[in-house]
Amino acid sequence: MKKISIITPCYNEKDALYECVKRINDLFQKELNTYKYEHIICDNNSDSETVNILRNIAAKNPNVKVILNAKNYGSVKSTFNGIKNSTGDAVLLFYPVDMQDPPEKIPELVKNWQKGFDFVVGCRSQREEFFLMKQTRKFFYFILKNFSKNEIPMNVSDFQLVDRKIVNQMVKLKDNFPFIRTLAFEYSDNYTTVEYTWKKREIGNSKEFFKDYISSAINGLISVSDAPFRFILMIGILVSIFSISYGLFSLFYNIFFQNDLDKGMPTLLISVLIFSGLQLLVLGFLGEYTSSMHNQIKKQIEVNEKEKINF
């Protein structure tokens, strides 16, 4: 009987935990009853109430395994550590405790994996969220798809079922900040996609803030490609050509048609502001790449596990 591993990061999620675990257990009692499973919950130093709930769940269900981290390492590092601790023939890399990625899609992921695909990717074709956030994500996915060195589908998510042979390659990666949703694409092109609606959160509140989304997006772009450098270079070349052309035009226009150069001050100020902004943008990207290289050169920081339950 084949085994499926499911990884769930957790931080102060006492309101959603019981339902999250129940949904998975029900699936393997019914639709997926020909498979064994382990549900690895990676807790990022939550409050005592959340930890007590985790202990209670694990005591009643041996399929639920809990890793209690000594501190909050964030969802990415704790999830990757959970993947390292998994033993299944296939691993669901990320199953959120808020169930916005619907557990009802897991049987479809498993069915496609059994057809021989190395991994099956969940794609969020629809999103139940406000307009501005939806458009921001669309722009990010457009950049990710078009600048990545691998062929990555639009709206790719971490909700992926990955075969053990690919997982074994992934966990060898020495990366302090792995971008999990694109890792499998580094090792195989043999995949298929499953589309679904990313649902509005119904239980509890999100522990992720806007800065966390920005950090994840920057990390993702840096991880998958050096194209931002080339993109900035192209912008720089185009802006330089435009500014030189406009400068020559302004010079000749003022020489031959008017004598009052003060009238050009607004244009000068706008130009200075635009180019200053571009310089800061370039420096920002350089800083991000330099910081990324610095973090990779440093010895990898492992997750300090305070306690493991049911392992």
Where do the model's predicted regions map?
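Acceptor/aglycone-binding surface of glycosyltransferases and processive sugar-polymer synthases
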Residues: 69-71, 75-85, 103-178, 199-218
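Donor nucleotide-sugar binding loop of glycosyltransferases
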Residues: 13-16, 46, 102
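Conserved donor nucleotide-binding strand/loop of the catalytic core
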Residues: 40, 51-80, 84-85
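Cell-envelope/extracellular polymer assembly enzymes that use nucleotide-activated donors
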Residues: 3-5, 38
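Hydrophobic helical membrane-anchoring modules
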Residues: 182, 186-311
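Short beta-strand-to-loop acidic/aromatic patch adjacent to the donor-nucleotide binding site
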Residues: 89-100
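Short, well-formed alpha-helical segments that are part of the catalytic scaffolds
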Residues: 13-30
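A conserved acidic beta->alpha catalytic loop
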Residues: 34, 43-51, 99-100
